[in-house]
Swiss-Prot record:
Keywords: DNA replication, DNA-directed DNA polymerase, Exonuclease, Hydrolase, Magnesium, Manganese, Metal-binding, Nuclease, Nucleotidyltransferase, Transferase. GO terms for biological process: DNA replication proofreading. The gene is dnaQ. A divalent metal cation 2 binds at D14. This is DNA polymerase III subunit epsilon. It catalyses: DNA(n) + a 2'-deoxyribonucleoside 5'-triphosphate = DNA(n+1) + diphosphate. One of its GO terms (cellular component) is cytosol. The active site is at H163 (proton acceptor). NCBIfam families: dnaq, dnaQ_proteo, PRK05711.1. It comes from Pasteurella multocida (strain Pm70). Its EC number is 2.7.7.7. Substrate binds at D14, E16, D63, H68, D168.
Length: 253
């Protein structure tokens, strides 16, 4: 359990690989060739991302290239996993990993650690949350691929023509935040009901004493700043700014 007031660090992560096996361990004999991860602290993206391409010790399967578009030629001058392993471990250690179909990526990560005799398992240094399982619980009986969730939740994934680890991690971060309630709560999560009651009382008090208040009209600069802010809110909420919707409704009447 995270102590009160300690920042919650989450890493949204995705990998691309040389391929996978249809039978047996899906990772056996294959390699990670790309890692993409984005950091969130207290449900806010920090920009402290981790993105790297990795040179494997085997060719990339043709079927895998069709999925992610990463060829042997693109990886020829990239570092091998042993050169970046410690940097990667330091980045994820102690965080909650958010991964769509986590057993796939975690299986590969643990396999790579094992090949280097690091004696590390991902779930021993991180808490792992499978967002695919979350989605299946929230939307039982429906398709819950990343693309399907984007369509369902109204998230733009138009740039996702091929799978790419960093882009997929960025999209998954949007999906996760939307599935779990959007932006950070305005109130302390430990006292939500108390905070709401207090605000309601303040609103009632303000209404009671507002009858004789002088109405001030904004000047042109203030009005433009307000409109610019509404446009920003509408962009950040992907067209779901209630104020903008209400203004549009009023204009039609």
């Amino acid at each position: 359990m995270t102590p009160v007031n300690q920042p919650t660090r989450q890493i949204v992560l995705d990998t691309e690989t040389t391929g996978m096996n249809q039978f047996g361990a899906h990772y056996e004999g294959h390699c990670i060739i790309e890692i993409g991860a984005v950091e969130m602290i207290n449900r806010r993206l920090t920009g402290n991302n981790f993105h790297i391409y990795i040179k494997p010790n085997r060719p990339v399967d043709p079927d895998a290239i069709k999925v992610h578009g990463i060829t042997d030629e693109m990886l020829a001058d990239k570092p091998m996993f042993n050169e970046v392993a410690q940097q990667f471990i330091d980045y994820i250690q102690g965080a909650e990993l958010l991964i769509h179909n986590a057993p796939f990526d975690v299986g590969f990560m643990d396999y790579e650690f094992k090949k280097l005799n690091l004696n590390i398992n991902t779930d021993a240094i991180c808490m792992v949350t499978d967002t695919l399982q979350m989605a299946r619980q929230m939307y039982p009986g429906k398709r819950n691929s990343l693309d399907a969730l984007c369509d369902r939740l109204g998230i733009d994934n138009s740039k996702r023509t091929l799978h790419g680890a960093l882009l997929d991690a960025e999209i998954l971060a949007d999906v996760y935040l939307t599935m779990t309630g959007g932006q950070t709560s305005l109130f302390d999560e430990n006292e939500p009901e108390i905070a709401v009651v207090a605000v309601q009382e303040q609103i009632q008090s303000a209404v009671a004493f507002s009858q004789d208040l002088k109405r001030l009209q904004p000047n042109a600069d203030e009005l433009q700043a307000h409109l610019d802010y509404l446009l920003l809110l509408n962009k950040k909420s992907k067209g779901n700014c209630l104020w903008e919707k209400r203004l549009a409704e009023l204009k039609t009447h």
